[in-house]
């Protein structure tokens, strides 16, 4: 389990939501929001506040420290991926062939543990799948969309054709 994120709390109470800021905010935005939230939720002014001073302070300490914020953002992304939420804007998480384990039998195949359900090697495809089902991506590469065999997660895999001339 990630140290900062409980899966059940992801969407309702992220540190960004506690302070009322967006993930792209800067330190000045964080400091300003922190002061506003402390004043708005101070027990003397608002005894029924749903946001506690402790959660405001924890959010501030995490987001104001660049290293802690990076760790928090990484854990937030991993937690969101486990739940299968869209983080790329087109509805699919994007991976590259290097993210997969390659097995060479009669035909090359690529395998990956599902980032959502964590089932081992449940996302898989073969070289023939790349040839038959890959589509050009407009950036001199190709995409293929594959599904986990254990859950409903679909992902996009980016890959590039290797020219034999480049290898010589």
Swiss-Prot record:
Keywords assigned by UniProt, alphabetized: Cytoplasm, Iron, Metal-binding, Nucleus, Zinc
Pfam families, alphabetized: DnaJ, Zn_ribbon_CSL
CDD domains: DnaJ
GO cellular component, as recorded: cytoplasm; nucleus
Regions annotated as coiled coil: none
GO annotation, biological process: protein histidyl modification to diphthamide
Location in the cell: Cytoplasm; Nucleus
Domain DPH-type MB span(s) in chain numbering: 91-160
Residue ranges constituting the J domain according to the UniProt record: 14-76
Function: Required for the first step of diphthamide biosynthesis, the transfer of 3-amino-3-carboxypropyl from S-adenosyl-L-methionine to a histidine residue. Diphthamide is a post-translational modification of histidine which occurs in elongation factor 2.
Family indicated by similarity: Belongs to the DPH4 family.
Domain notes: The DPH-type metal-binding (MB) domain can bind either zinc or iron ions.
Protein name in UniProt: Diphthamide biosynthesis protein 4
Organism (species): Debaryomyces hansenii (strain ATCC 36239 / CBS 767 / BCRC 21394 / JCM 1990 / NBRC 0083 / IGC 2968) (Yeast)
Gene name for this UniProt entry: DPH4
């Amino acid at each position: 389990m990630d140290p900062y994120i409980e899966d059940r709390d992801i969407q309702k109470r992220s540190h960004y939501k506690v302070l009322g800021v967006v993930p792209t905010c800067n330190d000045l935005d964080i400091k300003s929001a922190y002061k506003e939230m402390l004043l708005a939720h101070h027990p003397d002014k608002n005894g029924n506040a749903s946001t506690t001073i402790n959660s405001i302070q924890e959010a501030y300490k995490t987001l104001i420290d660049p290293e802690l914020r990076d760790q928090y953002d990484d854990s937030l992304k991993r937690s969101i991926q486990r739940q299968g939420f869209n983080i790329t804007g087109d509805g699919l998480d994007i991976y590259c062939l290097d993210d997969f384990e390659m097995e060479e039998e009669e035909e090359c195949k690529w395998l990956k543990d599902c980032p959502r359900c964590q089932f081992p090697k449940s996302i898989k495809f073969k070289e023939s799948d790349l040839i038959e089902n890959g589509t050009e991506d407009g950036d001199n590469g190709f995409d293929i969309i594959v599904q986990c065999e254990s859950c409903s997660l679909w992902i996009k895999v980016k890959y590039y054709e290797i020219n034999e001339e480049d290898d010589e």
